[in-house]
Every structure is written in C-alpha cells, then in structure tokens.
C-alpha cells in the first residue's frame, strides 16, 4: 500500500511544471518533462511500476480495489440510515422524496440546506433497498457492517496461492451468490409471499416451482417494476450460466487464450469489453424493464441511472480496446493463431469500417443540414423525412411474440411512467444513424490503433517504440500522433461525444413522453436547430435562473455547478490547443522573475528549482481530463435542472 501511495504522490508531483531536485529521479533523468513522459508511457506496465514480480501480487491489486469499493458503499449506506429518510420513504414511496444526507457546509443557509437535500437525491439506492427487502434503518446498519466485513475478506483473499484458482473460483463464487440472491428475493423481498404460497400449494409439483422462475409476472401496475419472480429467474439463469462457463474453463485450461502466452492485458481487454457491453445493456434494461420498485415514478433517478451506466459502459469498452493494443505491443509474438489471422486481415477490417463511417457521416449529417436549410428558408415541407420501416417491423415482431415470451400485456403497453415500445418517427431514424456514426468512428479509431500497434505500412517497426511515443524525428515524416496511445486519446473524445448523443436522445425522448409532447419533439428533432433550441437551450432555462440579484431558488447550487463545470470543460480546450510553446515561455518568465527577486518559491530555495515545460503528452492528458470531467459534470447539472 505504501508503494501505491508513493507512486500516486510522485505522479501528482510530475504533473507540475516545477520540480525539486531532491525528488528521486530513478533512470528517467533530470528533466521533469522527460520523466513524466516516461512514466505516462509505461504506466500500464504494472509489473515495473509497482515492483510486482508475481501473479499473486498483481491479483492482490484487484482485491484491494474491491475492498475500497465496498468500503465506499458501506459509507454510503451508513449515511442513508443515519441522516436519510428511508423509513418514511418505504411507508409512502410516491409521496416522500428520498434524500441523500444532511448538508453540513456552514456557507449554506437553512433554506438552501432544505432545498439542496431533496435536490441531491438523484439515485435509485432507496428503491433498491426497498425492493430487496429492507424495512428499517437497523437493517441498513447491519448491511453496512456486512459490507465492511466483506471488504476485509477481500484483503485476505489477496493471499490466495494461485491466480487460476482465484479466477475460476471467483467466477464460481459469483455464480453461487447469484443463485443464493434469487432465494433471498423469493423469501424476503416485498411481494414474495405469494410466490412462497405458489410453491407451498404443491411442493411436489415441478410445475409450481417453475412458475416462480418464469417471466409470468411482467410489469406490476402498482410499482411499475418487474415482479420479484422475474428478477429471481434472472439471477438463477446468471448463476447457472456462470457455473457452466467455469466448468468449461477448468476443462479447457484457458485454451480460449488464443494459444498465446498468459497476458494480463489480454484478460483485462476481454473483461472490460464484455463488461462495457453488459453495462450499456443494463442502462437500456433499467428503463424498459425496471427491476426496482417505484423507480419509474422518479424521473430524475431513472434518467440518472441511464446516463450513469451508458458513460461507464462506453469507458469500459474503450479500455478494452486500449488494453488489447497494449497486449499486442508488449505481450504478443506474431504467429499463426486467431490473433495473427486477425492482424493479417487488418487492412480489410480498417478499410471496411472507414467506408461505413464515411457513408454514415455524409448521409446522416447531410440530411440534418438539408433539413436545417429548408426550415431556415421557410419551406419546411421540403425536409427529407425517412420512415423507420425496419424499426416498426421489429416492434410488430415484439407484439406478435408476446404469447411466446409470456411477458403479459402490461409489459408491452405504455404507462404514465414508461413506454416499452414508444412510437418512433423520422427524427428517431436520423438520430439513430447519427449515433451509429459516432459508434463506428470510435470503433474505427480504436481498432486501427490496436491492429497497427505492432506496425503499419507507414511505420513497420512501430512495436519497438512501445505503447506511446511522440515522433520519430523529421526524417520519417508522418510518424507523429500515430502511437497506440494517440489512438486512445482521439477515440476518447469520440466516445465522450457519442455517449452525449445517445444520452441527449434518451433524455429528450423520455421528457417528451412524460410531458405528453411527443409531437413537438418528433418534428423538431428532424433538424439540428431543433435539438439546440428545444432540448438544450429550453431545458437550460431553469438552471440559468437559479440565482440572480433578486435571490436564489432550489436549483441555485446546481446552477453554480453548471457554471463551474463549463469552466473546467473550457479549460480543457486551452491545454489541448496551446501545447508546449506557450507554457514553456510562461514558466520560464515566471521562474526568471522569482530568481531575479531572490524570492522563495513554494518554500523551495531558488537554486533547486528548474524551469520545465509541459510536453505535448502532458498537455493532451491534462486537457482531456478537464474536457471529459467538465463535460460530464455539466450534463449532470443539466439533467437535474431539466428533469426535476
């Protein structure tokens, strides 16, 4: 743990353009810019960075992370029991607004404390606690204690003797926990009593037992959520599939590893990619088939849950491609296996994806620009509106298949709070293809970066330069910005913007459904000005009037956060556009004046301060962090202001 904190402290110091000679330099040299570039370029070499020379030590890092996550969850649930209103919420889930915790900031007035407490509750934790059977704060405290004990167990598990045992045994443990959780839901969750009665009516009948574990419940009209039997069936299925996969892994001896040497980056790449896909699917399922009781009545929590999981899913999937590229650079030797065959056909893969993105880009943006021009020229009847025929056909298949799936009529009908199969329009057709453009472009950048990580027609010996490098000198023109790290850097902007597109679309769609104004959104989503005017600008109104010279309202804190996040987002562009040169001159000038005045700078003697500049990689990294964090926090405040 000390090594981890030491590395974290050094990384923080390395970001600063001022360094102290007394810092341990290692083999990276005296120049802070060079040292930071080397650390950043090798940050994924966990064996070197953390001085780890055994698989068990590397595996211990994962369990340490799980322990920290469990402790964070324990603190969260403790505060709900200590200063929340959970017991009042379960007595009247439709009339009581759940709160997070008290605000102890002395700068808040009592009025602002009261309004901010309610406004902060944009999460479904209360709904989950009620759905799984919690009925009192005392039970929440016991659950918190259980989380803390489990966190301690995670640290003990890091001492296991075999990584293979941890990997396969961990999958088995998760599978059995999933099956046991299904049993907990059937016996203790609200509404489970009728399920127990079904089994007890005919304990010797297999049919009665299967009735508990099928999709016969559907959406309940009172809670607007799936029946407990559906959720229990889901967890039983997950457990059985997990046990089956674990058995396959034991038999195959990790033969799925493409006959390559063991690679942590390959394992992590596959895990991140699958995890990203499942997380994105969960975002869709949480709205269409909500598993938490009364969640659809809470519009803000529903929207936040969707946006939260879409961002996590996109970032996990991006990380999967990144670690796949690191695997090819560091751990893979070209051979006639599955990976080698993929690399042999990379030109076909990259060119095909390129043509797809060009087709989507020209057609989707071209349609939007045409429709904007027609609306601006006063002839909106000349807009191109394409009927989503294929999507309508898919919806009809769902309706026809209702008896087969056994979902029940409530599952496929619109309600005041959710719509399983909403009516789609030409605007939906356009935005779906715009989202497809963003997704395919992101995948193109990531796949190209990974498949070209060992070498390309322009740069055949790229692998010898490592995962990240700046340029290979003027003698090899075009070798700048083509490392695998650079592809991740570019793709992260694309994936951030793509997630914004489909969260914008989801949010506007559900807002129009909740407000019964679908006709307006269907018409105005056909052109870009409609998106800006009727979604972004119109829904900013509540935040923009959060506080003024006459006072403030209950959204004032979020209006302030909206402004602050905008500033962080804009700061990102400053670093992205103005790289090494500007900061070099600025820092040199500042250091010169301090040395000339014989001043002490940040408590250090003048003779131990060396002026250095931000490298291109430094500025890109800092700019990307500001851009993404500012963008997400800006949208967070926007969702609260527009939905609440």
Curated annotation (Swiss-Prot):
From which domain of life does this come?
A: Eukaryota
Q: InterPro entries in the record, alphabetically?
A: PSI_PsaA/B, PSI_PsaA/B_CS, PSI_PsaA/B_sf
Task: Enumerate the residues binding chlorophyll a B3.
Answer: 574, 582
Q: What is its EC number?
A: 1.97.1.12
Transmembrane feature ranges: 58-81, 140-160, 166-190, 231-249, 264-287, 303-329, 348-370, 429-447, 487-508, 555-577, 621-641
- Could you say which residues bind chlorophyll a B1 here? 566
GO terms assigned for molecular function:
4 iron, 4 sulfur cluster binding; chlorophyll binding; metal ion binding; oxidoreductase activity
List where in the cell it is found.
Plastid, Chloroplast thylakoid membrane
Pfam families in the record, alphabetically? Answer: PsaA_PsaB
**Catalysed reactions, as listed in the record:** reduced [plastocyanin] + hnu + oxidized [2Fe-2S]-[ferredoxin] = oxidized [plastocyanin] + reduced [2Fe-2S]-[ferredoxin]
Q: Which UniProt keywords apply?
A: 4Fe-4S, Chlorophyll, Chloroplast, Chromophore, Electron transport, Iron, Iron-sulfur, Magnesium, Membrane, Metal-binding, Oxidoreductase, Photosynthesis, Photosystem I, Plastid, Thylakoid, Transmembrane, Transmembrane helix, Transport
GO biological process: any one? photosynthesis
- Membrane topology term: Multi-pass membrane protein
Cellular component, GO annotation: chloroplast thylakoid membrane; photosystem I
Q: How is the cofactor bound?
A: P700 is a chlorophyll a/chlorophyll a' dimer, A0 is one or more chlorophyll a, A1 is one or both phylloquinones and FX is a shared 4Fe-4S iron-sulfur center.
Q: Where does phylloquinone bind?
A: 583
Say where the protein is mainly found: plastid
Enzyme class of the recorded protein, top EC level:
oxidoreductase
Q: Which residues does the annotation say bind [4Fe-4S] cluster?
A: 471, 480
The record's section on SUPFAM superfamilies has: Photosystem I subunits PsaA/PsaB
Q: To which protein family does this belong?
A: Belongs to the PsaA/PsaB family.
The entry's function note states:
PsaA and PsaB bind P700, the primary electron donor of photosystem I (PSI), as well as the electron acceptors A0, A1 and FX. PSI is a plastocyanin/cytochrome c6-ferredoxin oxidoreductase, converting photonic excitation into a charge separation, which transfers an electron from the donor P700 chlorophyll pair to the spectroscopically characterized acceptors A0, A1, FX, FA and FB in turn. Oxidized P700 is reduced on the lumenal side of the thylakoid membrane by plastocyanin or cytochrome c6.
Give the record's subunit note.
The PsaA/B heterodimer binds the P700 chlorophyll special pair and subsequent electron acceptors. PSI consists of a core antenna complex that captures photons, and an electron transfer chain that converts photonic excitation into a charge separation. The eukaryotic PSI reaction center is composed of at least 11 subunits.
Protein name listed in UniProt = Photosystem I P700 chlorophyll a apoprotein A2
- Record organism: Amphidinium carterae
Taxonomy of origin reads: Eukaryota, Sar, Alveolata, Dinophyceae, Amphidiniales
Q: What gene name is given for the protein in this entry?
A: psaB
């Amino acid at each position: 743990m000390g090594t981890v904190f030491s590395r974290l402290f050094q990384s923080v110091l390395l970001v600063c353009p001022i360094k102290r000679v007394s810092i341990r330099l290692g083999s990276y040299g005296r120049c802070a810019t060079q040292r930071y570039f080397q650390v950043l370029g090798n940050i994924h070499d966990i064996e070197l960075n953390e001085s780890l020379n055994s698989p068990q030590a590397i595996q211990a890092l994962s369990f340490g992370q799980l322990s920290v996550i469990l402790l964070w969850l324990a603190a969260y649930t403790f505060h709900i029991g200590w200063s929340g209103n959970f017991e009042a919420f379960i007595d009247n889930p439709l009339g009581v607004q759940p709160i997070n915790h008290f605000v102890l900031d002395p700068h808040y007035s009592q009025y602002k404390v009261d309004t901010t407490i309610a406004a902060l509750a944009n999460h479904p934790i209360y709904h989950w606690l009620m759905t799984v059977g919690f009925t009192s704060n005392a039970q929440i405290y016991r659950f918190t204690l259980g989380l803390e004990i489990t966190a301690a167990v995670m640290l003990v598990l890091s001492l296991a003797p075999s990584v293979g045992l941890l990997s396969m045994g961990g999958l088995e443990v998760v599978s059995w926990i999933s099956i046991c959780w299904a049993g907990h839901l059937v016996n203790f969750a609200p509404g489970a009593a009728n399920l127990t009665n079904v089994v007890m009516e005919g304990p010797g009948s297999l049919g009665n037992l299967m009735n508990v574990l099928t999709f016969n419940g559907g959406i309940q009209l009172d809670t607007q959520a799936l029946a407990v039997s559906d959720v229990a069936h889901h967890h039983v299925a997950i457990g059985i599939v997990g046990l089956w996969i674990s058995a396959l892994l034991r038999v195959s001896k990790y033969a799925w590893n493409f006959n390559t040497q063991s690679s942590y980056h390959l394992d992590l790449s596959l895990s991140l990619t699958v995890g990203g896909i499942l997380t994105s699917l969960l975002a869709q399922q949480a709205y269409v088939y909500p598993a938490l009781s009364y969640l659809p009545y809470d519009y803000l929590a529903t929207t936040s849950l969707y946006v939260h999981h879409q961002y996590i899913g996109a970032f996990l999937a991006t990380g999967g491609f990144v670690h796949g590229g690191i695997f090819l650079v560091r751990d893979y030797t070209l051979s006639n296996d599955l990976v080698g065959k993929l690399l042999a056909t990379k030109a076909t893969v990259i060119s095909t994806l390129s043509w797809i993105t060009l087709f989507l880009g020209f057609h989707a943006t071209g349609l939007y620009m045409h429709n904007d021009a027609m609306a601006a020229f006063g002839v909106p009847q000349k807009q191109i509106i394409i009927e989503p025929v294929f999507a309508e056909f898919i919806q009809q298949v769902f309706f026809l298949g209702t008896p087969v799936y056994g979902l029940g009529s409530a599952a496929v009908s619109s309600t005041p709070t959710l719509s399983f199969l909403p009516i789609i329009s030409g605007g939906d057709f356009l935005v779906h293809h715009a989202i497809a453009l963003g997704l395919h472009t992101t995948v193109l950048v990531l796949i190209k970066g990974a498949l070209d990580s060992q070498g390309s027609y322009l740069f055949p010996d790229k692998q010898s330069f490592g995962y990240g490098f700046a340029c290979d000198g003027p003698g090899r023109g075009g070798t700048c910005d083509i490392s695998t790290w650079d592809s991740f850097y570019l793709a992260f902007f694309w994936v951030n913007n793509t997630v914004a597109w489909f969260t914008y679309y989801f949010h506007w769609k559900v807002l129009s459904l909740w407000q019964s104004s679908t006709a307006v959104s269907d018409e105005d989503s056909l052109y870009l000005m409609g998106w800006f005017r009727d979604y972004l600008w119109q829904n900013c109104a509540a935040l923009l009037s959060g506080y003024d010279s006459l006072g403030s309202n209950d959204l004032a804190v979020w209006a302030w956060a909206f402004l602050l996040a905008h500033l962080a987002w804009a700061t990102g562009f400053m670093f992205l556009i103005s790289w090494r040169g500007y900061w070099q001159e600025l820092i040199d000038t500042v250091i010169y004046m301090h040395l000339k005045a014989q001043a002490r700078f940040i408590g250090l003697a003048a003779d131990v301060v060396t002026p250095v500049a931000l490298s291109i990689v430094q500025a890109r990294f800092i700019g990307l962090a500001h851009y993404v964090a500012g963008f997400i926090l800006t949208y967070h405040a926007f969702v609260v202001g527009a939905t609440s």
